[in-house]
A protein has these predicted regions:
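N-terminal glycine-rich flavin-associated loop
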Residues: 88-105, 131
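Glycine-rich, Trp-frequent "lid" loop and neighboring beta-strands that shape
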Residues: 65-66, 105-138
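Short, solvent-exposed alpha-helical surface patches in well-structured domains
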Residues: 11-12, 44, 75, 109
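Intrinsic disorder at enzyme termini
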Residues: 1-12
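Active-site beta-strand/loop segments that form the cofactor-binding cradle
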Residues: 23-91, 116, 124-129
Length: 138
């Protein structure tokens, strides 16, 4: 049994590592010093991630993503994780809740635009007695 990385996985790691070094690292000092991630910078990085084929990599190809398998996705996330998390987050579309449970109308309105980088996805949770403390939910 082979436990090494496939050629595709090696390419994803190399591409993502180069992206982190060339597009994310140069902005880390500013973001960490100011505590601000400027909207213009978010849009710039997101556009470059889309151009590089790295945005929405976890989403299935049927909905416009790259369709990475779980191991390859984790390798991708590991490389992105080398950078400041706020910068890392600008490279990833995560509308998985809509993918898994959304209606066709919700997919059209939210999922596909998120995957194309036209809209931002987000998630909010609350529960009586826990508020927004996700660890306190029962």
């Amino acid at each position: 049994m082979e436990f090494g990385l496939s050629e595709e996985q090696k390419l994803i790691v190399e591409t993502t590592r180069a992206f982190v070094e060339n597009e994310l690292y140069p902005h880390e000092r500013e973001v960490e010093r100011t505590g601000v991630l400027r909207r213009e910078l978010i849009e710039e990085i997101k556009a470059k991630a889309i151009e590089a084929g790295l945005y929405a990599a976890n989403m299935p190809t049927e909905v416009g993503g790259a369709g990475l398998d779980t191991v390859t996705w984790l390798l991708y996330e590991k490389e992105l994780g080398r950078a400041n998390y706020a910068l890392h987050w600008t490279c990833v579309a995560r509308p998985s809740n809509i993918l898994l449970a959304g209606t066709p109308e919700q997919r059209e309105k939210y999922l596909y635009p998120c995957i194309r980088g036209e809209k931002w996805d987000c998630l909010a949770m609350t529960e009586p007695g826990a508020g927004s403390d996700l660890r306190g939910m029962k």
